[in-house]
A protein has these predicted regions:
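Acidic, metal/ion-coordinating pockets
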Residues: 1-324, 333, 337-340, 348, ...
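Short cysteine-rich clusters marking metal-coordination/redox-active sites
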Residues: 345
Length: 352
């Protein structure tokens, strides 16, 4: 809980320094550390209510419902949703198959519309009347609907790593999967077809930062300038290789001449790639349609020495005071226990 004031300060600092449009999202398993809680007031429930209050103060854009978020049932989730907390889950449904939370939302950041979908992973014990629908059934239509309204498609997922990989392979229109797997730590962005998959370690020890240079192509890749430089360097390397090969004494051997021919063909193919890329770059200068989308990432460790946001620190202090009051109410103080004396003992024990 204490790390949230540092997280808030870092998010504010980065937003101020970069002066770029941004989204603050969470893929779930936010509220609790165990799969189920007993009924009634508890330290865990007070902490969860505090986390929701802090995230609202931090103006979170979207949070997917994770399995651990259901540890105390639907009550805290439903209440906070009614107050405007942006819970998402496309596959948590009631007995009639109706979503219990918004399946997706569209957030506009700068001049880009981000379509954000939430999927909940396997739940050990579902609350009464709640069903976990198969994402394979509902996701195709939901992606089509969301894609029509957005420029970039983002999935907040607490599904297993294997399922996230399956989604990336099956739905290349999805640009980004932010995972919340309980057993994984910080995950470097991995590209599967045209989908990036990444996640930040659990328990709020790190702040994950993904900076995206987005273009209309919606295609991840190197910058075309970098790719062009690499191709030109490749031509230089092939030229050097051909010079060495042509100096060989066995130049008249048919097999060796065939090897030279293959390298020459490789060089010609790279030259064609360079010309095509130069043409694409010229077109990008006019409309930017073909430019690749690029990114960089950082996992920022939230250390004790970091600065904190005062308003968040005040909320945390209030939560701790509520927890102390809860514990105090459970301790019986100043209870008089009468001294029985020998007469009281004689009612049960024989005199000796």
């Amino acid at each position: 809980l204490g790390g949230l004031s540092k997280k808030a300060w870092q998010i504010r600092r980065i937003s101020t320094e970069q002066q770029k449009p941004s989204l603050f999202v969470d893929s779930g398993n936010l509220l609790f550390k165990q799969v189920q809680l007993p009924d009634g007031p508890s330290q865990e429930l007070l902490t969860a209510e505090g986390i929701i209050k802090i995230y609202r103060t931090m103006k979170v854009d979207a949070v997917a419902v994770g399995p651990l978020d259901l540890a105390s049932g639907l009550g805290i989730l439903t209440h906070s949703r009614q107050q405007g907390f942006p819970w998402l889950s496309a596959n948590l449904v009631d007995e009639e198959g109706r979503p219990l939370f918004a399946p997706m939302l569209i957030k506009e950041t700068g001049n880009i519309k981000a379509g954000i979908i939430g999927l909940t992973g396997a739940v050990t014990s579902l609350p009464p009347g709640v069903t976990l629908a198969d994402w394979r059934t509902l996701l195709p239509a939901l992606l089509e609907e969301t894609s029509a309204q957005s420029d970039i498609l983002i999935l907040l997922s607490s599904l297993s790593p294997a399922e996230n990989q399956e989604i990336a392979r099956q739905f290349p229109a999805l640009h980004l999967i932010l995972a919340a797997n309980q057993h994984s730590g910080n995950m470097m962005p991995e590209q599967v077809k045209n989908t990036l998959i990444t996640q930040t370690a659990t328990q709020g020890k790190y702040q994950g930062i993904l900076t995206i240079d987005w273009h209309k192509s919606g295609r991840w890749g190197k910058t075309q300038g970098t790719e062009l430089t690499e191709l030109r360097n490749r031509i230089g390397a092939l030229d050097w290789q051909l010079q060495r090969m042509r100096r060989r004494v066995d130049l008249q051997q048919p097999d060796y001449l065939d090897k030279i021919k293959l390298v020459e063909q490789d060089r010609e193919a790279v030259i064609r790639q360079v010309k095509e890329l130069e043409q694409a770059l010229a077109a990008d200068h006019s409309d930017g349609q073909n430019a690749a989308c690029t990114f960089n990432h950082n996992f920022l460790a939230l250390e004790r020495s970091m600065a904190e946001t005062p308003e968040i620190r005040a909320i945390i202090t209030g939560i701790k005071e509520q927890i102390q009051a809860l514990h105090a109410s459970r301790i019986r103080k100043d209870v008089d226990i009468p001294l029985l004396g020998h007469k009281g003992c004689m009612s049960c024990h024989q005199a000796q």
